[in-house]
């Protein structure tokens, strides 16, 4: 099964696995087993972030997988992300060093700016009074230095609108390799998809199933009638069809699960496809962004006065 996985090519030349394991909201105590199961099933990309609070546990499992020769380090693609409290240029290398220590790695394959937002250093949680003016150019220069050092084999961004990505591409010496954003049949990101393709930036989808396990998001992505009709006709689960849709759209997907059965099911998306006439039906699905980033918006204290401003109208 491991051989069945397909890859995308990044603008660095690196091979980027088309399906990865998301670890957002994967509880400590469960995430390690999920990572071990996923790697044994054939996953070759683990998507992490410092703010998820589970990198130490993932690091311990990775170490064991390497020691037991289940997989070689060079055959795994590991992503992590710079949190909003570490955007000051002097804090960027320290943040990556902490992540590398926790993950017990010498390098990450991809390091992303998690959000285009800055929060006061040392803040716990996100309070409006701790939001600071954003300076992406300075932060990006520090990211480029990490790329130069080899500690981050590729660098990129997450939650960037088309405009924010375009602004960054104007000034970047090392262009971002990836923009990781919410993307699923109920939030297709058509404009951003087209822009990324035109600029050689790979779009990677978090919440490709609409985060069904998340309590604070109202998500009906997997209940969509069109998705379910296609799933029934193809003899697949709605989750498999949502993931396969993403691959056929030309982007990678990062489904999160700590259930071994679902981890396996989510990986079984390579040896079949959605026929064109069914694929066309997805254009009829009503669109709604789930992760609005409202926690970064405040009418007086934030650089983003509205959700429209945070996403530059892409809502």
From Swiss-Prot:
The active site is at 52 (proton donor). Keywords: Acetylation, Chloroplast, Detoxification, NADP, Oxidoreductase, Plastid, Stress response. NADP(+) binds at residues 23-24, 47, 114, 158-159, 180, 207-213, 256-258, 262-266. It is an enzyme of class 1 (oxidoreductase). GO terms for cellular component: chloroplast; endoplasmic reticulum. Its EC number is 1.1.1.-. Its main location: plastid. Induction: By drought, salt and cold stresses. GO terms for molecular function: alcohol dehydrogenase (NADP+) activity; aldo-keto reductase (NADPH) activity; NADP+ binding; steroid dehydrogenase activity. It is found in: Plastid, Chloroplast. PROSITE patterns: ALDOKETO_REDUCTASE_1, ALDOKETO_REDUCTASE_2, ALDOKETO_REDUCTASE_3. InterPro entries: AKR, AKR4C, Aldo/ket_reductase_CS, NADP_OxRdtase_dom, NADP_OxRdtase_dom_sf. The keyword rRNA-binding does not apply. SUPFAM superfamilies: NAD(P)-linked oxidoreductase. The keyword Heme does not apply. The modification N-acetylalanine is found at residue 2. Belongs to the aldo/keto reductase family. Oxidoreductase acting on a broad range of substrates: reduces ketosteroids, aromatic aldehydes, ketones, sugars and other aliphatic aldehydes, and oxidizes hydroxysteroids. Aldehyde reductase that catalyzes the reduction of the aldehyde carbonyl groups on saturated and alpha,beta-unsaturated aldehydes. No activity on alpha,beta-unsaturated ketones. Can use propionaldehyde, butyraldehyde, methylglyoxal, (E)-2-pentenal, (E)-2-hexenal, (Z)-3-hexenal and (E)-2-nonenal as substrates, propenal (acrolein), crotonaldehyde, but not 2-butanone, 3-buten-2-one or 1-penten-3-one. This is NADPH-dependent aldo-keto reductase, chloroplastic. It comes from Arabidopsis thaliana. The lineage of its organism: Eukaryota, Viridiplantae, Streptophyta, Embryophyta, Tracheophyta. The gene is AKR4C9.
